Amino acid sequence: MKKLKLHGFNNLTKSLSFCIYDICYAKTAEERDGYIAYIDELYNANRLTEILSETCSIIGANILNIARQDYEPQGASVTILVSEEPIDPKLIDQTEHPGPLPETVVAHLDKSHICVHTYPESHPEGGLCTFRADIEVSTCGVISPLKALNYLIHQLESDIVTIDYRVRGFTRDVNGMKHFIDHEINSIQNFMSEDMKSLYDMVDVNVYQENIFHTKMLLKEFDLKHYMFHTKPEDLTETERQQITAALWKEMREIYYGRNISAV
């Protein structure tokens, strides 16, 4: 896409929001409580602040303020306000390609924020536990928050990911014409690295005329030992392993498709 010569500041708002899910099976009530305590500590407010601060570093944002809070009995929230410094728009890379992991890239934001909220969850029956992290990166200006996508998914262990990207508002060029998007995008997947795409089954639901893009991701490989908390699969009977595998897989598909699935 040809670079636009704008009249004044770029007023487009670009928002990237996604849910990241981690699934676990805890055989007993003690294991369930242990998993919730473990995941709550692993992703406490301090750890999340480190992750979001590194996100700011990746996209070159200047941190204005950090608000963070751990909650009882569980959960945490962090919000970071960021700003930009003057930058030559000619230096901005707006092409469709994956962003970096922890490497630094120049990017500048204004009236923007990055926030995360966590939601550990379990049910007393069935042994299934889930951890959900809601993340939003919202920027105002020429930079797309999609550049932070790779890093954030790699930092948070993810069995299932749902991603939404939307461009809102408009900006004007020097001739007064409105522009409702200032970069090319066909799919959120184009901003992911090849190694990440190889790990997940993915599907897109995009509304191009509204500048709304949606991608869902489900981890391809299933290894039961990665989903057990303090219990080894070899300590279970074959029937137990099959039942737990079926329950976990059903849980993951229900979250992925966003609907309850009847037992076969």
UniProtKB/Swiss-Prot annotation:
Coiled coil: none annotated. Heterooctamer of four alpha and four beta chains arranged as a tetramer of alpha/beta heterodimers. This is S-adenosylmethionine decarboxylase proenzyme. It catalyses: S-adenosyl-L-methionine + H(+) = S-adenosyl 3-(methylsulfanyl)propylamine + CO2. The lineage of its organism: Bacteria, Pseudomonadati, Pseudomonadota, Gammaproteobacteria, Enterobacterales. It holds the Pfam family AdoMet_dc. Its cofactor is pyruvate. Belongs to the prokaryotic AdoMetDC family. Type 2 subfamily. The gene is speD.
